[in-house]
A protein has these predicted regions:
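Active-site neighborhood of HAD-like aspartate-dependent phosphohydrolases
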Residues: 1-10, 20
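Long, charged amphipathic helices and adjacent flexible linkers at domain junctions
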Residues: 13-24
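C-terminal cap/substrate-recognition subdomain and adjoining C-terminal extension
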Residues: 28-29, 35-169
Length: 169
């Protein structure tokens, strides 16, 4: 799974194909796995404080992820994220089927959500900031007024106008 993810983030694999291959490896796992995954995830130092600071200045914060709602939603709620879009894992009778359902969060969906959320808030795209780390984030990074490569793969660092190279805020 890690190898497939890494190759997709470097832009070597089609994201949709890579996602389906990764998810297929999860077939048969109990949905209790989400609790175990959540317990292992930690926010980068300063991430929640950054969201709080942005809110105090009147900004909205969105998270569009190629990850899964089953963990992303809980993290977003804990951090106070205003908008969330991620992939959905199919679960039947308490077990993962190895499939996703609904709209897959591709690079085009990431751009669409940036545009939707900007329009919803009466903003021009030039008034938005987008951060990402993988090839799937590049179109979104390039569409925003300020595009930032965050601890990103080389392909993203080479094309993003701004970079954050340390994981802590």
């Amino acid at each position: 799974v890690a190898e497939i993810t890494e190759r997709a983030m470097r832009g070597e694999l089609d994201f949709r194909q890579a996602l389906n291959e990764r998810v297929a490896t999860l077939k048969g796992l109990p949905d209790s796995i989400f609790e175990k995954v959540y317990a292992r995830i930690h926010f980068n130092k300063g991430a929640k404080e950054l969201v709080d600071e942005l809110h105090s200045r009147g900004f909205k914060v969105g998270l569009v992820s190629g990850g899964f709602h089953e963990t992303v939603d809980r993290l977003a709620k804990e951090a106070g994220i205003d908008y969330v879009k991620a992939n959905h894992l199919e679960v039947i009778d308490g077990f993962l089927t190895g499939k996703v359902y609904g709209e897959i969060v591709t690079k085009d969906v990431k751009v669409a959500k940036l545009k939707d959320w900007a329009a919803e808030n009466g903003l021009k795209l030039s008034q938005n900031i987008a951060m990402g780390d993988g090839a799937n984030d590049l179109p979104m990074i390039k569409t925003a007024g300020i595009g930032i490569a965050f601890c990103a793969k080389p392909i993203v660092r080479a094309q993003a106008p701004y970079q954050i190279t340390e994981p802590d805020f």
